[in-house]
Amino acid sequence: MAAVFDKPSLFKRATPLFSGFDGPLAFAVFLLASAGLLIMYSSGFDHGSRFVDHGRNMLIAGFILFVVAQIPPQRLMALAVPIYVVGVGLLIAVAIFGITKKGARRWLNVGIVIQPSEILKIAMPLMLAWWFQKREGQLRPLDFMVAGALLVVPVGLIMKQPDLGTSLLVLAAGLAVIFFAGLSWKLIAPPVVLGVIGMFLIVWFEPALCADGVRWPVLHDYQQQRICTLLDPSRDPLGKGFHIIQGMIAIGSGGMFGKGFMAGTQTHLEFIPERTTDFIFAAFSEEFGLAGNLLLIAGFIFLILRGMVIAMEAATLFSRLLAGAVTMIFFTYAFVNMGMVSGILPVVGVPLPFISYGGTAMVTLGLAVGMLMSIAKAKRLVQS
């Protein structure tokens, strides 16, 4: 009988599962998720289930975060190759017999409908971090070329669907790993300089490049039109330019302190398109103004800085590269979303992390934060 009463309480048994968790990271995620719930309640006023579903998605993502945080980084490393191979295989399957919606072939029916490109947001940094860990201490230019090939294949398959937003996120995650692995600035500078020059040329020659009948190589027609609309939204104010114009109106009308919670006229009169998903930042800006935006941006900056600290303090090269790449995913998500809503980047369909509605994206974010927690936890357990 004594053995029965000597059993530790449920709290004591659960405590080790939370030991080593990174408090500042959890706090940043909690604040951003709370802001997401707040603005979802307002922007989804005519879809009562949207707020409930968003909360459910957060709970699912939180559970996934907790589970992944219990997996040691060395086990994550062992999963890198299988996850990458499965992800690329599913992308090939999508290209052959995927489901087409609105002109894009991005989904696959495997009993349930899935979007395999989401897997690559996690699989790509895992795979490249594994590759450079295996080559640690003997890196050669050829190793960076192999890493580039591992990156280009899935990015090319995703762009072919077409899905520019997801391909940008996967590309950013992969390039972050390659950069943190020690790629020479001599190789980084030329494409960056050429990219900047290219952007200036596009802006300078916009009237000629965006004239009727002109087609750009590489990009799909709708992608070209998005760039041209960004440069001059007034060319189609009720069509392709409507999103950008209404987003900028909402942001500007918020002023310094906003119109108040549930008082956004652009939002509640339904002028803002996709106000619970891609353009939720416009709804947030209208109701909470510049002050609210600065607080939200500060939350993302804190999250990103904390992720970089975890990366720098990680015990192994694999953990450092993975944490750095995951942190870059957060940065790319936030920068691209806020940029496109503000009219400084083309509309590419990238959600705002922890704020926008979307189950798949929320699960991906849960996986990403879980991996950061795993790396931070491993470091703390080693220190203790």
Residue ranges and their predicted role:
Residues 26-243, 282-342, 367-371:
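Hydrophobic alpha-helical transmembrane segments of multi-pass inner membrane proteins, especially
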Residues 1-12, 333-384:
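A juxtamembrane structural motif centered on a specific transmembrane helix
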Residues 12-29:
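N-terminal membrane topogenic signal
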Residues 169-170, 246, 263-268, 299, ...:
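Re-entrant/interfacial helical elements at transmembrane boundaries that shape
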Residues 248-291, 311, 318:
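Long extracytoplasmic/lumenal interhelical loops at the membrane interface
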